[in-house]
Each structure stands twice: as structure tokens, then as C-alpha cells.
Amino acid sequence: MKAVTWHGKRDVRVDEVPDPTIQHSTDAIVRITSTAICGSDLHLYEVLGPYLTVGDILGHEPMGIVEEVGADVTHIKPGDRVVVPFNISCGHCGMCSDGLQSQCETTQVREQNKGAALFGYTSLYGSVPGGQAEYLRVPQAQYGPIAVSPEGPDERYLFLSDILPTAWQAVQYADVPDGGVLAVFGLGPVGQFAGRIGAHLGHRVIGIDPVLERRDMAARHGIETVDPTDIDDVPAALLELTGGYGAHGVIDAVGMEAHGGAGAAVAKFAQAATGMLPDAVAQKLIENVGVDRLTALHNAIGAVRRGGTVSISGVYGGTADPMPMMDLFDKQVQLRMGQCNVKKWISDILPLVDDPSDPLGVLDLTTHTVPIVEAPDAYRTFQQKSDGCIKVVLKP
């Protein structure tokens, strides 16, 4: 089968690899019909190479048709149309029972001290072959795959795999009161959906992003937008827009791809160095030096009102990043963050996705749909934010 594989920093290729097979009674094989490139895939493209091996199959936002199931998989059958959540969880351990599927005790990558295994996301998360391929072996398929309607385009359901529940969780974690103000830093795919969800729930939403195409897309869905490149002091501007109080909740949907700000020089050096050092040394650099650029997070902390909540959905990778602890403590700011617990939120989101009126605008996100053989070019376009690119869907 064809699969998108990692070959080095900014070097992904489409290779012919063996088709996956059932290995355990809880497995399923899914023929992929659509698979998206996630913003966090760019971390593999750029920074996290020390945890990858040449030939690793990427991708964690897939959906398709069930081809085969193991003996213990009974809730789906061959021919069903399913979305595959990006995290692999069992559904019956203590963590899953508590709605923390991203911390599943059955699939935790304990040797790396990490949570649940993820598709296509380095040795840190289990080195599980990913979904940017023609076929995917799905472990823990007795629980994970989400059966969806056979009707309608894939893009109506595809984003249930990751970014839509990630955005939903981010809004829930932001804890905005009825009629309150939600600010969203970063209007990439997760930020777009977070803003739309906030508006759907009745919040006033302010989105901050330097890219015109992203701001225009957000504005179509009732989100006020701010261009941070036109402003010297972003938190001060947000305070002015909110009567001097700040937002009740602020979402950082940017993560380590942000530019400038506190720690940026060290982070820029560390990110570049990971591509030049032996893997063992580069891993230590990532684990012990701040590799994140924290402008968005610092701005979020500055823009949130006293007693408010900062919700972090953007992915960060460093363990020694500087944080403004005095401001956090003095303002009594609450922080919530983490990998999305996809299955926890599906019962809330699926009816909205099924709704023909498309209240969350799931059909107005994808800007580029290309054959999987064009994945290398699509990665470059997505990373460079060129050609108005906001979201890429690959078709095997």
C-alpha cells in the first residue's frame, strides 16, 4: 500500500509498504478514504525527528471503511464507515472510565512516561503506524472507532478524529460563563473550531491570528478578529476590547509553532539543533531545554481576566520553558490543558455534525484536498501557510 513516511527533517515521502494485518483479537483493519494533516504533524516535520525512525508512517486524523475485524470486535463490522480517534484507548481501564481516554492505562507508553499511545506520533507515543496510508491497523478497535452515517462527504465526519473534539475540550476547559468572552489565540484548524463552538454556545468570541485567510474564515462564522501584527501590545488590546477586564477564558491554540517572545532565541536554537545532533543528544536537548516559543501562551495569560481560565490545546514539547509564575499566581489564573479525550466528547458533538444545517461549519474548513501521492508538497504548503492553506485532506 501507499503510505506517507518520515525520512528526516522536512522530508516526508510516499512509499510502498506492506499492508497491515490483524495481530490481536481487538484489532480492525480500515481502508482509509480520507486522512488529514494535523498542525501537530508539523512538529514531526520540524522538531521531533529524534523520536522518529526512517520509514515511520505518519498521520492521526483518518476515517474509512472497515475491511476486517478481530474476534473481540463486535460494535463495528466490515463495510461500516468509521472515524478513528487519534489516541488509542481501551474503554475499560480506570482512566478511560473517568473520561481520560488520553491517559489510557492499557496503552500508556510507560517507558517514555507518556499517556495513551497515538497513531503515527513517534516513539514517545508508541511508534504505532499512522493513518496517512491506504490501510490502517486499529488496535483496541473493540472501543475506539466511531461508526458514522454512510451518507454525506467524508469532511462532515473526518474531524471527529482529532481537531473537532480537541476544540470542544478546549472550550469546555476555558470555562466561560453564559454570555461571557472567549479569546482564541491561533485560528488554525483547532482555533477555527474552538471559535465556532464558543459562538454556538453563546459566547462572544475574539480570535487572534496574523494570517488574513484565517481571520476571514473565522469572521464568516461570527468571530471578531484581531491582527496581532498591527498591535504593539496584544494583551492590552484585548483588555480594551473587554472593558478593561480581559476575557473570561482564553484558548492557546498555537503551541510550539509560535514565533518570538520569551525564550524564543533559546527555543529557535534548540529546534534547529535537534535536526543536526545525534538522536540521543537531541532527545536530551528536547527533554531539558525549552524548545517552545511561548508568545501565544504569555499573551493568553496577559489577556485573561483575574480569576479566569487559560485553556491550552496547542501542543508544547519542552520541559524547561519559562513561565510567568508571579502573574499566574497574582491573577488567580486557572490553567487546563492536555491531549483531547476524544471519546468523552463524541456524544456531545456527533449530533451537531449530523445536523444538515452544519452549525459548526465542518464543511467550511478544508482548503486543500489532494491525492495522497502529493503529500510531500501538501506538507510544505501547510507548513508555509502558502496558497491560503488552512487545512489539508489527503485522499488515498
What are these regions (language model features)?
Residues R81-V82, E134-Y135, P145-D232, A236, ...:
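Mid-domain Rossmann-like dinucleotide-binding core that forms the NAD(H)/NADP(H) cofactor-binding site
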Residues H298, K343-P396:
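C-terminal hydrophobic helical "lid"/dimerization subdomain
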Residues P18-T35, L48-S97, Q101-S102, P129, ...:
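Glycine-rich beta-strand-centered segment in the early N-terminal region that forms part
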Residues R306-S313, M323-L363:
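Rossmann-fold dehydrogenase core element
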Residues H92-F185, L360:
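NAD(P)H dinucleotide-binding glycine-rich loop of Rossmann-like/cofactor-binding domains
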Residues V211, Y316, N341:
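Residues in the short beta-alpha loop(s) of Rossmann-like NAD(P)-binding domains
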Residues A174, D216, E224-Q334:
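Glycine-rich cofactor phosphate-binding loops and adjacent beta1-alpha1 units
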Residues Q23-H24, K77, P177, Y245, ...:
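Residue-level recognition of short, solvent-exposed, well-ordered loop/turn junctions
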